[in-house]
């Protein structure tokens, strides 16, 4: 499952919690949430659209965490592409995605992954 592969990878690289859903009991000011928002399969090779939301106590902290996530996702020598089950990592977009309901600062990056 690409979600668990991505979660384990980011946990090994980041110093903040990596979650698959928001934990209402958590008091962490910085964390990331990963979510699969789509997927396809072509010639028996699966692909996935993954979003990674980076949360911070300030807009700057959220943006800085987003940049760190992007660096680890896209690095050719130590990034996600080095994981055996992943054959392609592309950044589709990233943007300020502050949650106006909860007033929490976050950025969101959208990736297209090809995996096995």
Pin down the residues of each PLM region:
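Short glycine/proline-enriched loop/turn "hinge" motifs that connect secondary-structure elements
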Residues: 41-45, 100-103
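Small/polar-rich, solvent-exposed N-terminal microdomains that initiate assembly or binding
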Residues: 1-42, 60, 64-67, 71, ...
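Residues in well-ordered beta-strands of folded domains
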Residues: 19, 35, 53, 92, ...
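Oligomerization/assembly interface segments of phage tail-like spikes and tubes
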Residues: 45-57, 62, 105-115
């Amino acid at each position: 499952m690409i979600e668990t592969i991505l979660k384990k990878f980011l946990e090994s690289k980041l110093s903040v919690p990596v979650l698959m859903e928001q934990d209402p009991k958590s008091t962490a000011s910085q964390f990331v949430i990963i979510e699969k928002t789509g997927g396809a399969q072509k010639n028996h090779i699966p692909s996935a659209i993954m979003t990674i939301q980076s949360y911070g106590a300030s807009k700057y902290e959220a943006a800085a965490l987003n940049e760190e996530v992007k660096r680890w996702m896209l690095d050719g020598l130590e990034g996600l592409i080095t994981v055996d089950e992943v054959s392609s990592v592309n950044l589709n977009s990233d943007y300020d995605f502050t949650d106006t309901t909860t007033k929490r600062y976050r950025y969101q990056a959208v990736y297209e992954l090809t995996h096995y």
